[in-house]
């Protein structure tokens, strides 16, 4: 799928926002792309979403903002861990060449 090395093992986090419904389905779909690229998915204490319909309303979503702060700390931790590992000789996992098959043979 394209240049698989570009995103390989780069921590990723999807965030979705909406007035009401639809954010969890969007978040699920975005995370699938990270999985295809072998990207560790960074999470928070809840799904990475906030609610608000107009400018300034997201700032009123206290739980959503807490989720974003936790997500930011978790992302920073993952990036620091990766950097420390690389600086101390922890090798990236060996990648296998992709094999493509049909579900039915």
Predicted regions and their residues:
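Glycine-rich phosphate/pyrophosphate-binding loop and the adjoining helix
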Residues: 40-105
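Helix-loop-strand module that forms the ligand-binding subsite of alpha/beta enzymes
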Residues: 1-46
């Amino acid at each position: 799928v394209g240049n698989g090395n570009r995103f390989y093992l780069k921590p990723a986090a999807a965030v979705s926002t909406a007035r009401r419904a639809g954010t969890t389905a969007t978040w699920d779909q975005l995370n699938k792309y990270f999985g295809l690229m072998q990207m560790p998915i960074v999470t928070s204490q809840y799904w990475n979403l906030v609610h608000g319909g107009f400018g300034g309303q997201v700032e009123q979503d206290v739980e959503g903002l807490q989720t974003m702060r936790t997500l930011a700390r978790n992302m920073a931790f993952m990036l620091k861990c990766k950097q420390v590992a690389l600086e101390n000789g922890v090798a990236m996992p060996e990648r296998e060449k992709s094999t493509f098959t049909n579900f039915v043979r």
